[in-house]
Amino acid sequence: MIIVDDFIKDESLLEELRNDSTFFDDNGVYMWWGGPWNSPASTLKQRLIEEMWIKNSPWDFPRYNSIILSGFEYWTGQYSPSDVEDGKKDNLIMHYDKDEPLWHKTGEIVTPIIGTVFYPVPMDIDGGYLEIFSRGREGEPERIEAKYNRLVIFEAGKHLHRVSPVSRGLRSAIAVNLWSPPPSGVETGEIIFEN
């Protein structure tokens, strides 16, 4: 696992993320971008992914393996306390990241190369920890605080993980998985291409 605080150094990008009122409009909708070797980054989320994984990655793999890397699956998520009537959940259950459409159709588990969680906006929250069970389901999880401008890279397809309940405030994050080959939902349209 890699954790980098104050990850994005580009103040104009951070300001754009803080001020974009539409960034979290599609919470839980899985999107796909084939990377800059297929098409230029044309949305704020794609520009963020390019900054995270191509221009400023603490892990060298994506920069030097575009032949192997098919692209990026990404989605946003927001969680708030269960007593707040805003239609949001207060937690995310324990799971592995995987090709969800394929798993639902066949039961086969195919996982991404690596996973990422990034916190793009300031938050004042209690709870909402990313808990990663790298020692197995029964082991004590690693608990990572949701913190503004923090990048977390981990084996999301190998280790069970979840978001602990949020008891105060609004937890906001974007998750990005790197894939090769692309998950099946790209071909079937269950994972959308963001415009």
Identify the meaning behind each predicted range.
Residues 1-151, 158-195:
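Fe(II)/2-oxoglutarate oxygenase catalytic core
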